[in-house]
């Protein structure tokens, strides 16, 4: 794909498109904190004794010693919140319900965002998710069934909010700035994971577990106000954009029409190997990422024998690394493109290779360094950090090959990713239940193998040119 080096015109971090990227960063931050809130709160929701156990309180680790006196003094507040008798099986159903909800709306919401406008679809999803977060403590009082229903609907709302972002970027992001803008927006999820893991437990101890939902649900409502105020579907209709920036964006994306359409070329998509390369990349990427997100606290606790409070802080460190690598990767990718140092497909394959190969090497090395506390933590930080370099690779490749259908295809891509996450979580649970030491080794070896499969497939079939079926056709009637 040939692109004119016009990035300097109308560019700059003070431009409106970067403000949109920050709002999307905030919205992704909000959604991930709302999604993970229950994972933090449920420890207090179902356990009436652990947070009061003197033995647990007296076991200090290397990270949280300075907070020990404060945490002991404020524990009594958490006893005011209700405690529920939910079995581990019931908790598993509650956790998985939001993922099933996301899968239900990923594809249709991406399609509808392309037709009716991403601003309304995404904004509605964010608002619904925030309101349901606020009502989660009340729902818990009415019974576990209502909690499962709310989490499922919340997942459907978040599915609406995740995929439609690419419809906006197809119209707002100049080709030579796509990696940078999407990485700024996408890093909000990693930063949100870092924050919720850091402060979630402290909020529960200080104020009670319901305030985890109240605080992050309220933050989501504030984000909705910013969303509906600042976000517009395209630069042509934004009242605050400068003429210079508008001309820069419209001229940059002129060759990649993303106009609304009423039909989707499903057959052509199914036969398109470059799309399957993207799907396999998502499958591989989400396989290992889901294991890290879901089982990282468990791994740190069981392998390193770290107490719960230290485990929460240590579990948050990889996500600040992931957020940083996402932004740095986007900056580096666009630098290589703007200087014409590498072609677009070379950049996509380079960052995909780094994002799949490096975490695989770290995962394979993990079972051999368990005797070293520092080495284990460093590798655990590097896995999600290097993995997020994929955000400048196949993650945004749909904007290159089919910008008109970017949200629809992003929905399918995330569907592959969530499917991989469900399979990997189930497989991990089975493997570590048989034998902890060999089980973890097999988990990491299998994850590396899946990553290598996705990488090889993408390197062979990945492309960065607009596909023929994704181009807007002009019909001439005789």
From Swiss-Prot:
Q: What's the domain of life for this entry? A: Eukaryota
A GO CC annotation recorded here is:
apical plasma membrane
Asked if the record carries the keyword Glycoprotein, the reply is yes
SUPFAM superfamilies noted in UniProt: MFS general substrate transporter
Give compartment(s): Apical cell membrane
Question: Where are the membrane-spanning stretches?
Answer: 98-118, 130-150, 183-203, 211-231, 273-293, 317-337, 341-361, 363-383, 405-425, 442-462
Say what the protein does: Acts as a membrane potential-dependent organic anion transporter, the transport requires a low concentration of chloride ions. Mediates chloride-dependent transport of urate. Can actively transport inorganic phosphate into cells via Na(+) cotransport.
The name on file for this protein is: Sodium-dependent phosphate transport protein 3
């Amino acid at each position: 794909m040939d692109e004119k080096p016009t990035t300097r015109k109308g560019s700059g971090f003070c431009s409106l498109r970067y403000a949109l990227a920050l709002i999307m960063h905030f919205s992704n931050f909000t959604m991930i904190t709302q999604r993970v809130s229950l994972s933090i709160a449920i420890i207090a929701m179902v356990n009436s004794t652990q947070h009061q156990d003197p033995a647990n309180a007296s076991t200090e680790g290397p990270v949280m010693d300075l907070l020990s006196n404060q945490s002991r003094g404020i524990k009594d507040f958490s006893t005011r919140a209700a405690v529920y008798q939910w079995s581990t099986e019931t908790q598993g159903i509650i956790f998985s319900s939001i993922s099933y909800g996301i899968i239900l709306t990923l594809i249709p919401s991406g399609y509808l965002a392309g037709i009716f406008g991403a601003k309304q679809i995404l904004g509605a999803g964010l608002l619904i998710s925030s309101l349901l977060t606020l009502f989660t403590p009340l729902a818990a009082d009415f019974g576990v069934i209502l909690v499962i229903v709310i989490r499922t609907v919340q997942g459907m709302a978040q599915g609406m909010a995740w995929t439609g972002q690419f419809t906006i970027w197809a119209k707002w992001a100049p080709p030579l700035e796509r990696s940078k803008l999407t990485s700024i927006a996408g890093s909000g999820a990693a930063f949100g994971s870092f924050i919720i893991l850091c402060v979630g437990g402290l909020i529960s101890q200080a104020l009670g577990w319901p305030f985890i939902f109240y605080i992050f649900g309220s933050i989501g409502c504030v984000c909705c106000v910013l969303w509906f105020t600042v976000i517009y579907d395209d630069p042509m209709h934004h009242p605050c954009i400068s003429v210079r920036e508008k001309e820069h964006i419209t001229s940059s994306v002129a060759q990649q029409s993303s106009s609304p359409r009423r039909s989707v070329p499903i057959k052509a998509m199914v036969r398109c190997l470059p799309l399957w390369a993207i799907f396999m990349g998502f499958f591989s990427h989400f396989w290992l990422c889901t294991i890290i997100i879901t089982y990282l606290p468990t791994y740190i606790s069981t392998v390193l024998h770290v107490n719960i409070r230290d485990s929460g802080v240590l579990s948050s460190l990889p996500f600040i690394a992931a957020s940083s690598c996402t932004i740095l990767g986007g900056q580096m990718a666009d630098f290589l493109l703007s200087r014409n140092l590498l072609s677009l497909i070379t950049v996509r394959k380079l960052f995909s290779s780094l994002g799949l190969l490096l975490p695989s090497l770290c995962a394979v090395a993990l079972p051999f360094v368990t005797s070293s506390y520092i080495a284990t933590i460093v590798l655990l930080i590097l896995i999600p950090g290097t993995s997020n370099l994929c955000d400048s690779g196949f993650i945004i490749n749909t904007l290159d090959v089919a910008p008109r259908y970017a949200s629809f295809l992003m929905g399918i891509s995330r569907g592959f990713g969530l499917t991989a996450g469900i399979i990997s979580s189930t497989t991990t649970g089975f493997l570590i239940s048989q034998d902890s030491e060999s089980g973890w080794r097999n988990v990491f070896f299998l994850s590396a193998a899946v990553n290598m499969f996705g990488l090889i497939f993408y390197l062979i079939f990945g492309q960065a040119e607009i596909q023929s079926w994704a181009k807007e056709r002009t019909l001439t009637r005789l």
